[in-house]
């Protein structure tokens, strides 16, 4: 029942991710002309706490490092396939690139745990024990990314709020757009994404009648360098962008938290 509900939310979230939101929470005016609420104050849902990944699909591509050349669901173009088929983990290790599969386009797919906190009133922080990575989601308007691209890039976030009117319970989601990325891998077996990639994410939380809480993350990767661009008028799974869904269950505390370094294999 839970898995079916997650799939239904997944389908709905993909549609929302690709379309304009019905109602987007802007940093609006505060009560009685006061300052606008911070992102933390405006939050329609609470994402903070510890979450463990649920590997309910693609087990052999997520729990294990797939063999070279195995990327059946990823719409690579010819250059992307060439690079993926030439993957050599020893070269990544020698170059100090063990973390290429731990960038923003793939880190949430790796098995492990998340710890979500507020870095400050307008910045949401996500730490992963797998690869010991940190992501920062900036809700307040920011300057264009400066400096060198990074594994986690620069992530702009906004609340998308639903309900709260006419007796409908208030809820919502987080939409995140990440740019300014270093090249990385969409899978641990060297399936590439480029510095031109843009990662769109949609975070949805749901609560079951028994109290269990789940986090569903929709990820869309748009990469004109390595993902296949469809000919005009053609639609199909063989072309980008690349969309996938990842689920987590909330856990009580940090008892299972196990920070581990990046691995190229």
Protein language model features and the residues they cover:
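PEST-like low-complexity, intrinsically disordered acidic/proline/serine-rich tracts
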Residues: 2-6, 10, 20-265
